[in-house]
């Protein structure tokens, strides 16, 4: 996956605005802020250390599980789908491909995402993205969604 994220611009949306777009709620709302910049979505999530997914993963050395990295990317990408969804429609994960975990994420880290929709053939959407901490890529991959309902 070779794409570069553009510099931030556009309007920042915080959690309450994100809740108007995504159906996720705590503890599964995993974006603190997001920007739509052209064809890209840029998101952030601050790992506080008290999240449910850190309990037992791993005692004394907590790390954010890889599946949570993927969920954060998915939520960021789904912000891009929001304009085209009708009432009651829900994008669901259809697949993950070429996912690579490159750097661990720990409590106190701020995850920054960059995602874009590569291709769309309704009801399927194909995206790619990456998440970084302090400029280091933690995860990258391609993922797809199927829009259901409505």
For the regions a language model picked out, list residue spans one by one:
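Hydrophobic beta-strand-centered segment that forms part of the acyl-chain substrate-binding groove
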Residues: 76-112, 142-146
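Hydrophobic core residues within well-ordered beta-strands of beta-rich domains
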Residues: 28-30, 111, 125
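Short, Lys/Arg-enriched N-terminal segments with co-localized hydrophobic residues
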Residues: 3-12
């Amino acid at each position: 996956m070779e794409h570069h994220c553009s510099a931030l611009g556009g309007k920042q949306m915080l959690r309450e605005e994100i809740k108007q777009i995504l159906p996720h709620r705590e503890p599964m709302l995993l974006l603190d802020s997001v920007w739509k910049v052209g064809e890209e979505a840029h998101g952030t999530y601050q790992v506080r250390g008290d999240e449910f997914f850190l309990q037992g993963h791993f005692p004394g050395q907590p790390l954010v599980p890889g599946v949570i990295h993927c969920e954060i990317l998915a939520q960021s990408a789904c912000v891009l789908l929001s304009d085209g969804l009708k009432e009651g429609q829900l994008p669901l994960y259809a697949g993950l491909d070429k996912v690579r975990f490159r750097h661990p994420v720990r409590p106190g880290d701020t995850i920054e995402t960059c995602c874009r929709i590569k291709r769309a053939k309704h009801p399927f959407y194909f995206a790619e993205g990456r998440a970084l901490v302090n400029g280091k890529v933690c995860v990258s991959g391609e993922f797809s969604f199927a829009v259901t309902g409505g």
